[in-house]
């Protein structure tokens, strides 16, 4: 991912304002509600029968926290996303057989949640920078599939 110094500074500054645990829980919850076929990977999480059940599910929240912390780790290694996500790419490809399109969809949910949480601070320029990052992360996670 090619980011300017200004974009990197914006990402770093805005990320510091984000409650990562809440954002991760909300992003994964939204993914499961908006794209219900993604639930197939989480059937063992218990009740996913409605939007409120998904959004209140403790296991969804815990996994969302895990996901967003991996994303945050990627923010520290923007120049080596493929290396940063290599083991997760292998896991999701070889063992979990996740559709690589789901990574892009999750990235969309992360951007939506950031817009919601950051409000007016999430300017169009900031969104453009984060869109580059989530696309880069999705590509890195899908790398093993190629």
From Swiss-Prot:
Q: Please name one Pfam family that this protein belongs to.
A: Globin
**Matching InterPro entries:** Globin, Globin-like_sf, Globin/Proto, Hemoglobin_b, Hemoglobin_oxygen_transport
Any GO BP:
hydrogen peroxide catabolic process
| Keywords carried by this UniProt record | Acetylation, Heme, Iron, Metal-binding, Oxygen transport, S-nitrosylation, Transport
What positions are modified (N6-acetyllysine)? 82, 144
Domain Globin intervals:
2-146
Per the record, residues carrying S-nitrosocysteine are 93
The reply on keyword Amino-acid biosynthesis is no
Gene3D superfamilies per UniProt: Globins
Provide a GO CC annotation, any one. Answer: blood microparticle
Q: In which tissues is it expressed?
A: Red blood cells.
Q: What does this protein do?
A: Involved in oxygen transport from the lung to the various peripheral tissues.
Q: How does it assemble?
A: Heterotetramer of two alpha chains and two beta chains.
PANTHER family, A to Z: HEMOGLOBIN FAMILY MEMBER, HEMOGLOBIN SUBUNIT BETA
So what family is this one in? Belongs to the globin family.
Q: What is this protein called?
A: Hemoglobin subunit beta
Q: Which organism is it from?
A: Microtus xanthognathus (Yellow-cheeked vole)
């Amino acid at each position: 991912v090619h980011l300017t110094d200004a974009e990197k500074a914006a990402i770093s500054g805005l990320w510091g304002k984000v409650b990562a645990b809440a954002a991760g829980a909300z992003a994964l919850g939204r993914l499961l509600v908006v794209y219900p076929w993604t639930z197939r990977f989480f059937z063992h999480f218990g009740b996913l029968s409605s939007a409120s059940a998904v959004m209140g599910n403790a296991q969804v929240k815990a996994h969302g926290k895990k996901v967003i912390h991996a994303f945050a780790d990627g923010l520290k290694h923007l120049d080596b996303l493929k290396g940063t996500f290599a083991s997760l790419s292998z896991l999701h490809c070889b063992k979990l057989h996740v559709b690589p399109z789901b990574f892009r969809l999750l990235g969309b949910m992360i951007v939506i949640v950031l817009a919601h949480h950051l409000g007016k601070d999430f300017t169009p320029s900031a969104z453009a920078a984060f869109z580059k990052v989530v696309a880069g992360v999705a590509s890195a996670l899908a790398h093993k599939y190629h």
